[in-house]
Amino acid sequence: MNNVLAAFIMLTRLPFWKIKEVPAECFKHVVPYWPLVGWLTGGVMAAVLWLAGQIMPVSLAWILALIARLIVTGCLHEDGLADFLDGFGGGTTRERTLAIMKDSHIGSYGVIGLICYFLLLLQLHHLPLGLLCILVLSGDCWSKFCASQIVNYLPYARKEEDSKSKTVYNRMSWHELLAGFLCGLLPFVLLLPIKLWIATLFPLLTFFLLYRLMKRRLQGYTGDCCGATFLLCELSFYLGSLILIIN
């Protein structure tokens, strides 16, 4: 229970810390529960999207849904994506890439990358409201599971004391991996039309490409890499689903 609570405390800005004081050690064991947190963050997006979509155009409702998740998560993942893009865009060596990613100032790669990311996301407002709500919940959970596999396949690239959060995640046991997989995949099985199940492959492909990039450049991962992997896996799921729907 402490590990689950730690996951919600780490990945959201909601006052879960008021429920119970969680030992610092528990934050090393949060990775298997990322997809479970996706049920909350994706659920908030879907709820805001659905409710706002009843009284305004889907395009505006979609923007409000995106803002809602930014508020709930404190822009945690977007900050990671910006740092990731700055580091891999501006760094040519392992040491330089890590140094840039740790810099608190955003650079041109981060700014342009975030603009492109949100421009692509905004195109989803063309989808029917009900289907978009389902995609939001499914994509959040599954993409968090895909991103969690970075921890299983790569070592941490920095020393623990150099970590921004002062926490290095533990790798998952087989039963934790299974639980995360089921939690991430369940929305697909329960909500998505069967023709869209193949969309699960797009985040997996994105994960593999990012894994190869991190292994070659850093020989490991950082927290920023995890956030970037989640958002890019999610974006690939949305765009892949859009392609499947159009065709």
Regions found by a protein language model. Give the residues of each.
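Hydrophobic alpha-helical transmembrane segments
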Residues: 1-74, 90-92, 103, 109-247
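Glycine/small-residue-rich loop that forms an oxyanion/phosphate-binding "nest" at active or ligand-binding sites
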Residues: 79, 90, 99
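Coiled-coil dimerization/phosphotransfer module
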Residues: 97-100, 105
